[in-house]
């Protein structure tokens, strides 16, 4: 029996610090399962545990905390990438026997990856071509071509207890709501988490992650319009905020927080708790700016910005119960 489900999702273009939010939730709450519902190894989560930094891509972060994990049926799996990540975690002393994989995940083939390799707006992981074959009903499910080494990891039981779902990418990379076609190949909104095998009525809290400024990797004309790479402040934010993709290593494009897009993402996703991270970076550059109604608003101090931004969000997003500002690189103070 499923008791309740909490969900962590991105509210912008990914890279919002979902990994450290998940880590903090796992430290302070009892979950029976941690489940990944979308994407593949094109995503990347950074987790700090016992003063060490770990990276995961397709395997849910719960594996680092000794919790059972599930890679759900909406995910795309490259067998070689999965094996490499399992070996990486095993080499660091983590129990990979806690991992389960839906038999319905779609397998990324070498031809998928080869086709995707020269796409400058992709991570080159083969996700797009595999997704295309999925909807053409040509992709292979893991249950139909499962290597012997992975058969013991196939999910054969029903989810139960208390579940934490971790999303990949972010709202504005969603295949439907993002600036198509400059998007990812899966649904990034929380409703897609129900594909793991639970009804929507079991969802308890949706945690939405954002940063105090906006970033993205890859081309998007809407983002390019606002991006000002020649500005010294933007360059410094990239360096001070370590704005490099976990998966690609590419520097992220940075611009000021788009308030209207954040509000839309919060309201459509149903976010209850908003976590806005890296607020300390704006103190370093001493600029406190948001974009609202296509006009830039400059605040004198970070505290003023946080206060005014909070007032605006509570007024425009009626489902919000709490807003958390985080400046710590390793964890969030709930």
Question: What are the residue ranges of the model-derived segments?
Answer:
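Non-transmembrane, aqueous-exposed alpha-helical and coiled segments at domain scale
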Residues: 1-334
